[in-house]
Amino acid sequence: MSGTYNNSSVQIYRILEQTRHIRLDDTSSESKAKYSKAKIASAIGLLSHLRDLTEILQNLRHVRESSALADVLRVCIQPHDLGGLGLDDASDLAAQQESEVLFLVSAWLEALNSEDRARSMPAPVASRPPGRRGMTLSEKIFAWHEVAYRGWVAPGDLIRVDVDWVIASEASWAGMETTYSDLGKPGIHRNDRFWLAGDHVVDPRIRQIPKVRALIDASERAKRVFKLTEYQGMNYTILHTEFYRERAQPGMLIIGSDSHTCSSGALGCLAIGLGAADVTLPLVTGETWVKVPESISIRLVGVPKPGIGGKDVILYILQQLKRNTVASDRIVEFSGAGVQYLSADARFAICNMTAELCGITGIFVPDQITRAFVANRRLQRHKNLITYFRPDNDAQYAAELDIDLANVQSFFARYPRPDDVVPVSDYAGMQLDGCFIGACTTTEEDLILAALVLEQGLKKGYRPVNHGKRKMVPGSLPILHRLRELCLTGVFEAAGFEIGVPGCSYCVGMSADQAVSGEVWLSSQNRNFENRMGKGHLVSSATVAASSFEMKLTDPNDLLCGIDWARWMSLRGPFGLTARMSAASHLTYVEPNNSPAFSQERPESSIFSRSTQEPPFSGPLRGKIQLLGDFIDTDALAPAEFLMDMKTNEQSGLHCLQHTHPLFRQRTLEGFNIVVAGQAFGCGSSREQAVMALLGCGIKCVIAKSFAFIFQRNMPNLGLLGITMPNESFYAAAKDGSEVSIDLLAQVIHIEGLRFVFQLSQMEQGLYRHGGITSAFRKFGNRLFEELTAAKNIGTSHMEEKCHAPSALQW
């Protein structure tokens, strides 16, 4: 072992020299004896060696390198359940453990290089510049991240923005890796800002299945190739859970290949879900494009009843606003006097289900609760880039609404619509086949409250009936660790619950846990679309817990009334902190800097061509109309049970709408290849297979009253023409089977002798012209977004050969 250790010590020195060009032998002659390689190598134990090297680098004023190695040490000694390796100085390290330590040293030092290559952002300023328009919270974050650094933006602006983090699951990475390969494997922007979590499909019970093994291998390959600093492997956490708890910081801009990326908005950062190809580009380039959306303001007022958390609050908001109404394709900003009663965990649940409102994302104005939450983190690097913004008093919102938290009670969202919300008492006694407490919506706070509800039931003599299934899945291993510390896992088990590994479990229904067709489930998850989880109804974790004893829908109020709320508050810890419990000090809010001269361009990629020749359209697009309705969701377009086999457009098309519109595919083959639909087409998840399935069927164009935000971006990325047509006269003329002609050059639709004008955005035009986002990157490289967002009259012309849609698994 000593020989292995000495070799590892030499390798650490070599990594330092090769990665950061630091040679300790190049120090002054006075320091050589003290800081020589031989001196360092004499330390006993690899971790002791690292500790000495950290101190030496600090003394030699290599502060960043010293800090990086200090972080490596913290990761090494942290318990596995808290994201570490669980090592200690007193034990000899096995060869595999030494190899992992060396990997971390290499990865964290390489992170300094990627940070050096990144474009610096100008410091924010203390006050609003004179004459600048009033901005919303989200507009300020966009303005701060805009590459041009104008210091302001307005709705409708097409801008390039720097991205702070990219996040993906093992399932969505499968498609992103394909896109990455199609781009020529150009490398990623920052190896310390890619959060990759195994949660959607992987499960210890099915790891041996080849398709699951392939997902694991792809993620492990990403870890090695990119030298990821933040990789925790499979079933450590649900994608959003530990990212929000330990990484997202106020003021950041985060892009993720999952529709519930919006969850991190709880901390005052802008977190937006997109499709796999759309997310791969900022992973590579460090930037993306945004057409600045409108925002709505929801002011939370009143005081919630004890035991009412974020899940019931967002169900109430869904009841009041409904899907695809005022929040559709807009950012939802939460503020108001009532937020002081909502913990960070409660805010997380509310932002999480902004996706079900059809909003782009949700975001809370940061406050002292936010600050206290972030301050509790383990690593300094994840709490030292905080920037607090708040909306101006004269900010312009598309709508401003009040929600009274005093009106919130235990609610029940009936299958198959998350906005079909009624009080639990209206359906009390409904027979259930399964009770599930889990999914990303369900926070640590929710699990603790569910355990206390179960505890009250057990004290009253309630016992679980023999029939039915009960499953509790924690959002992460740190949460499970906390529940064990609080002696609450035993409560779940005593109440008949099986405790699973962290993952999406029954929510997405792609892994070992799947509801049987026809079963009636009660779940604390976020989505209950048709063909997703049997007949799934949505409630809070407390309601699931109360209902689990008799397998009948039960209002939890009686059991909630028996809880000792002082104990409840003590158990919640920092994740359940509210304003009344936190230090009453003021935050320092800042403003985006107006520094256009500060803008720096990144080096161009070496894999693109400067050719600008663009052939004209060969003629109008013709076909026959196939009518569909409102809310055609991604679960219907690309059913979850077939996603792992959807490697190509053709494979995806085999199952398009087969559950909801079984004749759709055959009619497409018969020439009904122009879809005309209603509101919110493509709502639901970020999965690109929904677009791939339409392309694979032979659909040439989708015309709708409105599209879901992510789906609308996915269409031009993959080469499917999507047209938003608000004109009601068009729908009066568009009969099923009608002949239609679409002139893309003139942007006109001809039908039944009538003429209807449509518009494509500048970015849509550019992507169509170049054949999709992959082809555009091959042409422009890292200057892709600069080229396609440049202020110019793009016009439209013939699409180049469509890019091959990647095999992506997103939810």
From Swiss-Prot:
Keyword list (alphabetical) reads: Iron, Iron-sulfur, Lyase, Metal-binding
EC top class, as a word? lyase
> Where [4Fe-4S] cluster is bound, by residue?
440, 504, 507
One of the Pfam families matching this protein, by short name: Aconitase
EC numbers: 4.2.1.-
Family membership noted in the UniProt record: Belongs to the aconitase/IPM isomerase family.
What is the designated name of this protein? Putative aconitate hydratase
**Source organism of this protein record:** Aspergillus fumigatus (strain ATCC MYA-4609 / CBS 101355 / FGSC A1100 / Af293) (Neosartorya fumigata)
Recite the lineage of the species: Eukaryota, Fungi, Dikarya, Ascomycota, Pezizomycotina
The UniProt gene name for this protein comes to acoC
